[in-house]
């Protein structure tokens, strides 16, 4: 009996140890397989990310004219491929893949990185200026959003900047600015000569172009935006107002006055860009803001508002009187005008029409809630601050990621999204 019991115990332990050994062998094998799988996945991902960086470097360095390329190669024991495609004139998509081990081998894994590139819009700046001329930021000045000067950054006192500051030619003056963001010198972002012409092209392709029939004779268009998504307008050659739906007048949201001036105010419902082109020598290509320009859904209280306006001039954008719309002398300029828009003055500036007229005192502030880009920094008041408007510029954060229709771009590509 003892011998039989001992034998049973031995057989039992033998079976138990056999099963245990088999289990731990399987665990060890699975661990190795899992490690190999993880190594292959992470290596394939690293190759894909590196390939995306190679593609980005080639794109930013060479700026291919056909806006597309394709290449492949070997890396880290695996292989990669990069392909760039143009979705539309403002959007490029790059697809980078990494494979490890190389395709055809056991356990081969492929990972993909997709990157979207787009041209940066000028409305991403809180304030952009080609040159500051002899003007300087000083104590009491506050700039919201990023600021760029393509010339020098002139500073006196302690102005405050709530955003990144960049300049092409360094800092002048003895000031000590307070910058709640980064500062970088030697950054060149020129204003392209094609900014306004690109808007005209967009207006001619699905928008509205209002031509001056007697160019270079004076020609003015007077336009009022209505909160019901219509626009009322007339020209200096026709005293009768016409009211039409914006979607009918300009389906793509772009209106261009060719060889003329534009006078504009009202409440924008929808998304619109209005522009004026023409030669400064004939006094054309200007936009006159003759009253409040607001969004139907106020972005100051509703950051999700989809109403958006762009104001583009080949030369200057002026703040003017409401009476200009009525054809009367500008005797009563608006007090505390509000402009909710992105403003772009390609060869000129944004400034106040009444800056040196002693008749216009106690006008308050001009509040621009949006973005300003101009060739040179303009003024809205005289040096004593007695006339004109005190400037108050606030950046509309919606413009960080969205722009009015066909709004001018810097021509410089930037990464819009990176998907891994």
Annotate each predicted stretch with a short phrase.
Residues 2-151, 419-420:
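Beta-strand/loop motifs with alternating small/hydrophobic and polar/acidic residues, enriched
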Residues 16, 161-175, 185-194, 292-307, ...:
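Sequence/structural signature of small/polar-enriched beta-strand/turn repeats
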Residues 88-93, 99-208, 249-250, 254-256, ...:
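Short, ordered "entry" segments at domain starts
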Residues 183-260, 265-267, 278:
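Aspartyl protease catalytic domain
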Residues 247-320:
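Long, well-ordered mid-to-C-terminal structural blocks that present hydrophobic/aromatic surfaces
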Residues 302-369, 373-386:
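Extended C-terminal subregions enriched in glycine
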Residues 392-420:
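Protruding loop/beta-arch "assembly-hinge" segments enriched in small, turn-prone residues
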């Amino acid at each position: 009996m003892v011998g039989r019991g001992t034998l049973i115990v031995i057989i039992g332990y033998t079976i138990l140890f056999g099963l245990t050994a088999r289990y731990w062998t399987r665990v060890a094998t699975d661990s190795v397989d899992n490690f190999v799988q993880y190594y292959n996945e992470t290596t394939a991902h690293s190759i894909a990310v590196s390939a995306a960086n190679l593609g980005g470097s080639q794109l930013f360095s060479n700026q291919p004219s056909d806006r597309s390329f394709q290449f492949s190669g070997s890396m880290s024991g695996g292989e990669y491929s990069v392909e760039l495609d143009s979705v539309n004139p403002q959007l490029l998509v790059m697809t980078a893949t990494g494979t490890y081990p190389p395709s055809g081998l056991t356990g081969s894994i492929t990972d993909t990185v997709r990157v979207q590139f787009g041209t940066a819009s000028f409305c991403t700046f809180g304030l952009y200026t080609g040159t500051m001329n002899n003007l300087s930021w000083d104590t009491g000045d506050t700039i919201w959003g990023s600021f760029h000067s393509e010339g020098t950054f002139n500073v006196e006192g302690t102005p405050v900047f709530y955003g990144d500051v960049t300049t092409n030619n360094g800092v002048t003056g003895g000031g000590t600015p307070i910058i709640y963001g980064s500062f970088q010198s030697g950054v060149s972002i020129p204003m392209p000569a094609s900014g306004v012409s690109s808007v005209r092209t967009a207006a001619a392709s699905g928008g509205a172009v209002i031509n001056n029939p007697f160019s270079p004779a004076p020609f003015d268009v007077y336009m009022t935006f209505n909160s019901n998504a219509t626009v009322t307008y007339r020209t200096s050659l026709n005293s009768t107002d016409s009211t039409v739906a914006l979607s009918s007048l300009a389906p793509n949201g772009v209106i261009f006055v060719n060889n003329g001036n534009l006078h504009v105010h009202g409440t924008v419902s929808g998304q619109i860009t209005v522009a004026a082109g023409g030669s400064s020598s004939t006094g054309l290509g200007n936009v006159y803001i003759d009253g409040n320009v607001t969004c139907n859904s106020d972005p100051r209280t509703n950051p999700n508002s989809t109403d958006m306006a762009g104001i583009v001039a080949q030369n200057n954008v002026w703040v003017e009187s409401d009476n200009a719309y009525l054809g009367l002398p500008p005797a009563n300029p608006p007090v505390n005008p509000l402009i909710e828009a992105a403003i772009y003055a390609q060869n000129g500036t944004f400034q106040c029409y009444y800056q040196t007229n002693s008749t216009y005192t106690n006008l308050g502030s001009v509040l621009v809630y949006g973005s300003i880009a101009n060739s040179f920094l303009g003024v809205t008041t005289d040096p004593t601050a007695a006339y004109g408007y005190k400037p108050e510029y606030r950046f509309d954060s919606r413009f960080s990621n969205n722009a009015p229709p066909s709004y001018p771009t810097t021509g410089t590509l930037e990464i819009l999204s990176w998907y891994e």
